[in-house]
């Protein structure tokens, strides 16, 4: 049931302030209640002089049919999934592949993902769309 995919839109990477984000794929899984979930993978690069984590630097949301998806809690996570990856501090110049899981509203509509700098007045976003339907 694990599926790796590349973004269906070419603009899945960019710079947000002193951070770089590149969406690298997704995996379908089930959460602890058996609900369908999508695990979004992304590279987070810290170009700030202070060590920080993706969770502190970025806000990442996922949408289906224009409606925000809830975060998912996985107990039987697929291989390669690290629920704590976005909480790990990384130093200047380092890049870490992180994952964030969301509960799907359905398994046919595309999933749109947006990343933005958490504490910023900029409206810049890095966006990506995944066509998850089989």
Task: Label each residue range with its predicted role.
Residues 41-45, 101:
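Short edge beta-strand/loop segments characteristic of extracellular beta-sandwich folds
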Residues 45-96, 131-133:
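The feature marks short-to-medium sequence segments in extracytoplasmic or secretory-pathway proteins
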Residues 1-16, 28-31:
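N-terminal Sec-dependent export signals
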Residues 1, 86, 119-121:
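Glycine- and small hydrophobic-rich membrane-insertion segments that are intrinsically disordered
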